[in-house]
Every structure is written in structure tokens, then in C-alpha cells.
A protein has these predicted regions:
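Membrane-embedded, hydrophobic transmembrane alpha-helices
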Residues: 1-91
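Active-site lumenal/periplasmic loops and adjacent helix-entry segments of GT-C-fold
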Residues: 102-279, 315, 505-506, 533
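Transmembrane alpha-helical segments
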Residues: 104-109, 222, 226, 312-316, ...
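Hydrophobic/aromatic-rich transmembrane helices and adjacent perimembrane loops
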Residues: 189-192, 273, 318-321, 443-470
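Membrane-interface alpha helices of multi-pass inner-membrane proteins
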Residues: 264-267, 286, 299-314
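Hydrophobic, aromatic-rich transmembrane alpha-helices
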Residues: 282-290, 323-335, 400-421, 467
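Transmembrane alpha-helix segments characteristic
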Residues: 297-308, 323, 345-350, 416-438, ...
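Extracytoplasmic
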Residues: 473-627
Length: 627
């Protein structure tokens, strides 16, 4: 039942809030609430997983995790200073930024995630692809109860090298009895509060001004480059923004425009990025206070917060390491080299190093070393080509993609205060690494590093612009100048968000949903299905069952060598034999429109003559091979 899921999440968020209050007892609610959400989601990822490794991802493990977290919350509440309302003069500015984006985000989540329209599931442009994969991972973990999970998109033995804790935070609620939509969305709501709130608080802490924090917030979440210029030539081209498939001012590959809006193209469709930033942004806030404001006691809370980060979003963990290295160098250069100063850094590195190594050794780290097309050299992100040449001029590429923020980075850097420059030094380390090393088969995915560099750049540019315009005495001219800069820096993203809000795509039919429900109720949890390699395969996405060969758009970009599975899928449809079926452990065979459209010589008659028809609905038929 959904009520148990709400209570379960509330326990973790309450514990997170108690930790936030204990870490920063003098902070107002505008800090404690988003920071508490970050801690709460981190606990939700880490604690149930610890029990599930031993007991399986089942109800006993989840209940034990909740009991431990509830006990922690009670202990913290009893042993912390009594709760009192702390003056919070910046709260209004924060919520004035967060609430408008929260409304837009809630609407997009409503229309994009398993949105039931006339019996079918609909989605939006950005979720048409990735969400099908995330839904399948979430469901598979819940039905199999295995952690670390099996890799359900391929038959045979394959490592699950994807950061799966961004999925278990929803699998928890499926095990507790929630429906798929509720389970998918519940942890995302808390994560968005953390991402939006702590990005603002990071900017406020680093820049020392609520006004600068507001500008940095909008430059990051709604900033864009000059891609809108390509759509100003005619009314037809401009209208195409709102009707085409990925023809927006922030995602227009025909003109090498690829710097997407972080809300609609990263946070909503890509759960790893959302949950990674949910932990990373509060971590950066604590890093600043720990290092630059000399609150060394915060290392314990920082370590606790980031324990699950590598298996939530590996790119965010790497970004944090590089920023911490820059801050560590600052500590060595600019502060006394005493035990009181250096020991907290050593303890923080030791705790995270040991825990992260255990987490990553047989998962994402192993996959990065022996996966297909993973760790390799490559120049200039998506602008670089395999022959070493560039599609566009290096600086021209970033100018047209990032726009005003990129143009002002150099003056903003020299305008910044020394501590701000040191922090941005971590961003420069991220930029250099991401421009020369690729960590996955898809070069594009290095943007998950580049956006953290960009975040730090937005802080510096916001400070520069506010200081520049503060020197303009005439308030109307000051306001006009700021508005003009905001228009230039954000117009493309405004159009992109508008396009996303209007987008509506059919994803799964009523027959697909009915078939998935039947499979969920009647098929073995460890059953293997022979299906087409459609990325929308309902057997995997909706029922969470393992399939012989999933879509190449998923498995290739996870670094998997799936040649054998792909060939076996083709052979078992076109020239089936019982030996091959047994070899691959096939339990069920699906024939549907995807099979007949992608495999022209699919031989259903062979299966119909030998095996019972297990399920039929509309154009879909499933034959049971074993039993």
C-alpha cells in the first residue's frame, strides 16, 4: 500500500533532518530542509542496501533498515539541542527561486512518468528513452530480491556495472506494496528539494549574497547558449521548436548544439544524475564550510552524506574527489599544517576511500576497466571526432552552447575572491579531465562532469554581473541591464522547457500494460524471456523480467559486449532449436508487433507446434518453454 511507502520515506527524511540540524544547529529551515532531504535520500540508498546484501532485497531487510534509521532519528532528537526557530532572512529569496521550478518540475513529472491516458501510458520527449530502462531496473531488483542485482538486459553472466543505488531507492517502495508510479516518483520529490535548495545555499555561502545566489541559481538551471538564433530565421523554424523531436535551442544536433537544459534533459529523465546531485550539492556546501570556513567538525557529516555516492552516480563521486583535491591543496598552501587542520582531511579520505573501494570494486570500477569502450582518451567532449579533429572551433563550440556564462568566465575568475578561485580550481580540474578522458562508451555522458564545472562557473559569473550592475546608479538602467543579460543567457532554456511541457508521446498501450501485469502475477521472478530488442519492451520495463537481449541503446552504452546475445536472439526467432533454447535458459518466448517489424523471418509456427500458448492479448502471444 502507498501509505506504508509514505511513512517509510518520512522516517528516512526525518532522520536526515535530525542529522542536518545536528551538523548545523544554527542554520535556518531554508538550509535544514534541503540538507535534510539530501541526508535522508543518502540513508535511503545506503542503509537498506547494507542489509539487503546479507538478507536479500526483501521486506525483512527493509524493515530492519527502517528500524535502525528510526532509532537514529530518536537518538538524535533526544541528544541534540532543543529545536528553536532560527532567524532566516534569506528564506524568502530561496523559496522565490525554488518554488517556481518546483511547480514546473511537478508538472513535468506528472505528464512524463507513467501518465495514464485512455488506458495507455504516455510520456514526454525527454523520458521516452531512459525511463524505460530505469523502470525495468527498479522492478527487476524488487522482484528478484538480489543485491548486487543481476543485469536483466542480457542473458548469460554479466556484471551489473551501472550505479544501481539510484534505482534501489524506488525498488524499496515496490517491495512495500506501492504502485510503480508512486515508487518511481516518491524519492525523486525529496531529491529535487535537495538539488534545488542546496544549489541555492551553496551559491549563497560561496558568494555571500542572496541576490547573487538567485542569479547563479537561474543561470545554472535555466541558462543556455545562443542556439535560439538558429530558429529565428522564419516562423516555421521557430514553431518547429515546439513540434519537432529534439529540435530545441539547447539540443539541436544538426548545428552541434548539445548543451541541454539540466532540468528537462538531465534531472527528470536521468535518475543517476538526479540522485547524484541530490547528494553532491549538499556535499559541496559542506565542503565549502569544512574547508574554506574552517568548520573542521563537519568532516563526519560530509563522510556520512557521501557514503553511497559512487553507486548512485559515479560521475558525481569523481567530481567531488577533484573538488576536494583542489580544496585540499588550498588547505596545504594557505592554512597551518597542523594536526588539527590536516587530521580531518585524513579521516575523511580514509572513511570514504575504504567504503567507496568496497562499493566499486566489483561493480562500476571493474566495469570501467574491462567493459567495452569504457575508459579511453578523447579530445573535446562531443565536439571531438574519432580522427582527432573538431566539428567546430573549440572556443566557438562552447560559446554557442553555453553562451554568456562562458564568455564571462575569465573576467569572472579574476574578479572572484581567492577562496572562490580555489573552489573553481576544482572545476577546472574537472574540465581538463573531461576534455581528455572518456569514462563510458557514450562521449556525450562526460557532460555529467562538465555540468559541475559549469555550476562553479555560474557562481563566479553571477557575482561578476551583480557587482558590475551595482555600480550603475540609475536603478532602471541597472534593472534593464540585468534583464537583458538574463534574457540572452536563458531564452533558449525557456523555449526548451516550454517544448518539454507540450510534448506528449505514447509509450505503452493498454495491451502492453495488461501483458506486463499478467507476467508480474504469473511468471517466475527469475524467468528469462526471449523478446525483441525494442527499448520499450514491456516484459522488461513494466514487468521487470530478464530478457535475452535488450536494446543496444542501453546495453552498448553500459559497456556490454552483447554480440552473442544479439545473434542468439536472431537465431532463436528465425531458426529456433531446443538445444539453443536450453543453452540460454529461455523460459518464455514473446511474439508481438516489435518482433515481426524487426525480425522479418520470425518463425512463430515452430513454437506454436511445440509449446503451449501461455498468454495472448491483442497482437501479443507468449509461449511457455519450460514446464
Amino acid at each position: 500500500m502507498n501509505i506504508f511507502s509514505f511513512v517509510y520515506l518520512a522516517v528516512f527524511l526525518l532522520a536526515g533532518f535530525c542529522i542536518a540540524r545536528r551538523a548545523l544547529p544554527q542554520a535556518g529551515l531554508s538550509v535544514s530542509i534541503p540538507l535534510g532531504c539530501g541526508f535522508g535520500v543518502s540513508l535511503l540508498a545506503f542503509v537498506p542496501a547494507c542489509f539487503a546484501v546479507v538478507l536479500g532485497f526483501r521486506l525483512p531487510a527493509l524493515l530492519l533498515a527502517a528500524a535502525v534509521v528510526a532509532a537514529l532519528a530518536v537518538w538524535l532528537a533526544r541528544h541534540s539541542t532543543p529545536f528553536t526557530r532560527v532567524p532566516d532572512p534569506d528564506a524568502a529569496a530561496l523559496w522565490a527561486c525554488v518554488l517556481p521550478l518546483a511547480v514546473v518540475t511537478l508538472y513535468l513529472l506528472h505528464t512524463h512518468v507513467l501518465h495514464l491516458v485512455d488506458g495507455s501510458y504516455h510520456t514526454g520527449q525527454s523520458c521516452y528513452g531512459d525511463m524505460a530502462m530505469h523502470l525495468g531496473f527498479i522492478k527487476n531488483i524488487a522482484v528478484t530480491g538480489k543485491l548486487p542485482p543481476v543485469y536483466p538486459l542480457l542473458g548469460g553472466e554479466h556484471r551489473f556495472g551501472y550505479p544501481f543505488l539510484c534505482e534501489t531507492v524506488s525498488s524499496v517502495f515496490l517491495v512495500l506494496g506501492a504502485d510503480a508510479r508512486t515508487a518511481y516518483l516518491l524519492p525523486m520529490l525529496a531529491a529535487f528539494i535537495s538539488v534545488y535548495g542546496m544549489m541555492w545555499q551553496l551559491a549563497r555561502q560561496v558568494l555571500g549574497s542572496a541576490g547573487k545566489a538567485c542569479l547563479a541559481f537561474w543561470l545554472f538551471f535555466m541558462g543556455s547558449g545562443f542556439g535560439f538564433v538558429y530558429f529565428l530565421g522564419s516562423a516555421e523554424a521557430f514553431a518547429g521548436i515546439f513540434t519537432g523531436f529534439y529540435t530545441t535551442p539547447t539540443n539541436y544536433t544538426a548545428e552541434n548544439i548539445v548543451w541541454v537544459n539540466p532540468i528537462v534533459d538531465l534531472l527528470i529523465p536521468q535518475r543517476a544524475t538526479l540522485f547524484g546531485w541530490c547528494v553532491l550539492f549538499p556535499a559541496l556546501y559542506l565542503v565549502w564550510r569544512f574547508c574554506m570556513e574552517e568548520e573542521t567538525r563537519l568532516w563526519r557529516y560530509l563522510a556520512l552524506l557521501v557514503l553511497p555516492l559512487p553507486l548512485m552516480h559515479t560521475h558525481s563521486a569523481l567530481a567531488l574527489v577533484l573538488i576536494c583535491l583542489a580544496c585540499g591543496v588550498y588547505t596545504l598552501v594557505c592554512r597551518p599544517r597542523t594536526k588539527a587542520v590536516l587530521a580531518p582531511w585524513g579521516w575523511f579520505a580514509l572513511v570514504c576511500g575504504v567504503v567507496w573501494l568496497v562499493e566499486m570494486w566489483n561493480t562500476v570500477f571493474a566495469q570501467s576497466l574491462d567493459g567495452q569502450h569504457m575508459l579511453r582518451l578523447h579530445l573535446n567532449w562531443i565536439n571531438g571526432q574519432d580522427d582527432g579533429t573538431l566539428k567546430d572551433n573549440y572556443f566557438g563550440f562552447y560559446i554557442k552552447n553555453i553562451g554568456l556564462v562562458y564568455l564571462l568566465l575569465i573576467p569572472a575568475f579574476f574578479h572572484a575572491k581567492p577562496k572562490q578561485r580555489w573552489l573553481y580550481g576544482g572545476g577546472l580540474a574537472i574540465l581538463v579531465l573531461a576534455e581528455f578522458v572518456v569514462f563510458q562508451p557514450n562521449n556525450y555522458d562526460n557532460n555529467k562532469l562538465l555540468y559541475i564545472w559549469h555550476l562553479l562557473g555560474c557562481l563566479l559569473v553571477a557575482s561578476l554581473l551583480m557587482d558590475w550592475f551595482s555600480k550603475v546608479r540609475a536603478i532602471p538602467w541597472r534593472a534593464l541591464g540585468l534583464c537583458l543579460c538574463c534574457f540572452i543567457a536563458m531564452f533558449g532554456s525557456v523555449l526548451t522547457v516550454g517544448r518539454e511541457a507540450l510534448s506528449d508521446y505514447w509509450q505503452w498501450s493498454a495491451d502492453d500494460i495488461a501483458m506486463a501485469d499478467y507476467i508480474d502475477d504469473n511468471a517466475e521472478t527469475d524467468a528469462v524471456f526471449l523478446t525483441s530488442d525494442s527499448h520499450l519492451c514491456p516484459v522488461f520495463s513494466l514487468a521487470g523480467r530478464r530478457i535475452l537481449c535488450g536494446s543496444g541503446s542501453f546495453v552498448y552504452y553500459h559497456g556490454m559486449n552483447y554480440t552473442a546475445e544479439y545473434n542468439a536472439m536472431q537465431q532463436l526467432y528465425e531458426n529456433p532449436d531446443e538445444v539453443s533454447l536450453a543453452q540460454w535458459g529461455i523460459d518464455y518466448v514473446l511474439f508481438d508487433s516489435y518482433v515481426f517489424s524487426n525480425i522479418q523471418n520470425a518463425d512463430e509456427s515452430w513454437y506454436a507446434a511445440r509449446y503451449p500458448l501461455w498468454y495472448e492479448n491483442g497482437g501479443s502471444r507468449i509461449y511457455k518453454i519450460n514446464g
